[in-house]
Amino acid sequence: MAQALQVLKDKGVTISQEEEEGAIAAILLHDLGHGPFSHSLEHSIARGTSHEELSLAFMQQLNLEMGGRLNLAIAIFCNQYHKKFLHQLVSSQLDVDRLDYLHRDSFFSGVAEGTIGLERIIKMLYVSSDELVVEAKGIYSIEKFLIARRMMYWQVYLHKTVVGAEQMLIAILQRARELVGQDVPTFTTSRLHFFLSGKNEKEPIASWLDIFAGLDDSDISIAIKEWATHPDPILSDMCRRLNYRNLLHAELSGTAFSPERVKEVKAICQEKMGLSEPHAGYVCFAGEVTNSFYNPKQEAIKILFKNNRLEDIYTASEMLNHSALANTVKKYFFCYPKEIALWI
């Protein structure tokens, strides 16, 4: 963010010290509302509250403690500040967070297709009518960025093994929530118990913000280790699978898996593995994942040409496949235990 702001200032864009501080604070705090395991468990822990709502609540609480020092950061975060480009640097289809995590995750996952010209893109940023734009000579870098984003989602973030593990994690929390709701003795930290019992759903965010802030991955990891020996066969089986990386097999398809096939495989799980019907439903299930890599109906990535003409990358690009770029991609998954692969 600091580098992007400096590039804009060097090009004559007026950004005050207060605005720079506000934008940097906004980008540092904008994901503060993510809980353990980030997006994977966003709807499994603090149900009914998005991470954006939590981020704003944290920022407002900090602002009270800091005597209003974050007023500008909050305005930028909420897109209520007149210099729209500052919000776009924090949250848009070309925000610095996306640039950062694509660059970082490509490196650490070893997926070369996710590599982007980060420095080049930042140097091509400009402002026109208070909106963030990209100079025309940066169009190829933006094309590569969008292609890299698409590749990273389907090769890394939504890889079938990731989908299978993530769905197992969600199912484990769901089963634990059911047991806690039935008053079945189930080990949890006091913080995790608060959310599994649904108490947060009955109280305002501000009243449980400190409890949420105390949660981290270890609350979940320790619980899963303990639950591996829980008397409930469903919870213990799922936790042992995750602990020992005996992950469910996941199939991905461009078409939905038929209810008949899912029902058939569930029946095989019951017959060959001796599982109850509810247990089979936890280890054999189908669903879908979707992703949109670029939405021309939202704030567009605009390219600035020499005659001051602005054009959406969607139409300005000669290389990108428009239908593949703009359409929401939906893929269907089907998860089941590897042990029954011989019978299906």
Predicted regions and their residues:
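Histidine-centered, transition-metal-coordinating active-site segments
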Residues: 1-22, 32, 36-344
